[in-house]
Amino acid sequence: MIDVSSQRVNVQRPLDALGNSLNSPVIIKLKGDREFRGVLKSFDLHMNLVLNDAEELEDGEVTRRLGTVLIRGDNIVYISP
């Protein structure tokens, strides 16, 4: 049996983790296997995101440079800091 009372557990809520990633590069995976990379500028409670210097990726390679984009939160599969 593990005694968890002596262990520190660092648990973050999803929006807290996003807040920690503001003004940092992130990779966003969307439904339909689309992937974007850019600097996270803002987000809201629905996890809608604004990325600056956004690029669309395919197999890890840049296919398009998009500039500033808004990504709807419903389409996001994961966000990687």
Swiss-Prot record:
<keyword id="KW-0687">Ribonucleoprotein</keyword>
<dbReference type="InterPro" id="IPR022901">
    <property type="entry name" value="snRNP_Sm-like_arc"/>
</dbReference>
<dbReference type="GO" id="GO:0003723">
    <property type="term" value="F:RNA binding"/>
</dbReference>
<dbReference type="InterPro" id="IPR047575">
    <property type="entry name" value="Sm"/>
</dbReference>
<dbReference type="InterPro" id="IPR001163">
    <property type="entry name" value="Sm_dom_euk/arc"/>
</dbReference>
<comment type="similarity">
    <text>Belongs to the snRNP Sm proteins family.</text>
</comment>
<dbReference type="GO" id="GO:0120114">
    <property type="term" value="C:Sm-like protein family complex"/>
</dbReference>
<dbReference type="GO" id="GO:1990904">
    <property type="term" value="C:ribonucleoprotein complex"/>
</dbReference>
<dbReference type="Pfam" id="PF01423">
    <property type="entry name" value="LSM"/>
</dbReference>
<feature type="domain" description="Sm">
    <location>
        <begin position="13"/>
        <end position="81"/>
    </location>
</feature>
<dbReference type="GO" id="GO:0000398">
    <property type="term" value="P:mRNA splicing, via spliceosome"/>
</dbReference>
<protein>
    <recommendedName>
        <fullName>Putative snRNP Sm-like protein</fullName>
    </recommendedName>
</protein>
<dbReference type="InterPro" id="IPR016487">
    <property type="entry name" value="Lsm6/sSmF"/>
</dbReference>
<dbReference type="InterPro" id="IPR010920">
    <property type="entry name" value="LSM_dom_sf"/>
</dbReference>
